[in-house]
UniProtKB/Swiss-Prot annotation:
The gene is Pxmp2. This is Peroxisomal membrane protein 2. The keyword Acetylation does not apply. Seems to be involved in pore-forming activity and may contribute to the unspecific permeability of the peroxisomal membrane. It comes from Mus musculus (Mouse). Interacts with PEX19 and SIVA1. The chain crosses the membrane at residues 31-51, 75-95, 114-134, 173-193.
Length: 194
């Protein structure tokens, strides 16, 4: 009888692990909102790059090791750009277009899609170019060839997600929601950079 009781206790403790992790995340989010969002954004951005590299390796049947510098670039971008900037942009959007304003959901979506999306994409290309140590001519060439297709893909993929995010996801979870979706978005952007 003791082994069964012991097994049940272990199983119940394992079930509480996600609850404890969530409680810890919520506490950190409350105490250090920008830092928590920055760290989670950095980690999820690096995971998105890892996903892109893994997909690319399988498509090319490549046996090379993963490019650690790519993971680090995405980590830095998420940690210092996406996480903190997203935190403040969602706050700005929440307070500049409060939910009770007529057509708030449409106004927020238009603000996000027509202003924030192109700005973030431009910033992405610029920061990645800097982190890769490339010159301005490479940046300009990449903008000419990749910006418009990437923005069109952004509008297709992110518009429904951002409508849900900015209108239905609680403010403190919007960066995390976007970061989870961005796993696949960064995989797409990383594939453009190759």
């Amino acid at each position: 009888m003791a082994p069964a009781a012991s097994r049940l206790r272990v199983e119940s403790e394992l079930g509480s692990l996600p609850k404890r992790a969530l409680a810890q995340y919520l506490l950190l989010l409350k105490l250090y909102p920008v830092l928590t969002k920055a760290v989670s954004s950095g980690i999820l951005s690096a995971l998105g790059n890892l996903l892109a590299q893994t997909i690319e390796k399988k498509q090319r049947k490549d046996s090379r090791l993963l490019e650690v510098s790519g993971l680090l670039r995405y980590l830095v971008y998420g940690l210092f750009v996406t996480g903190p900037l997203s935190h403040y942009l969602y706050l700005f959007m929440e307070y500049s277009v409060p939910p009770e304003v007529p057509w708030a959901s449409v106004k927020r979506l238009l603000l996000d899609r027509l202003f924030f999306a192109p700005t973030f994409l431009l910033l992405f290309f610029f920061v990645m170019n800097l982190l890769e140590g490339k010159n301005v001519s490479v940046f300009v060439a990449k903008m000419r060839s990749g910006f418009w297709p990437a923005l069109q893909m952004n509008w297709r993929m992110w518009t429904p997600l951002q409508f849900i995010n900015i209108n239905y996801v609680p403010l403190q979870f919007r960066v995390l929601f976007a970061n989870m979706a961005a796993l696949f978005w960064y995989a797409y952007l990383a594939s453009l950079g190759k």
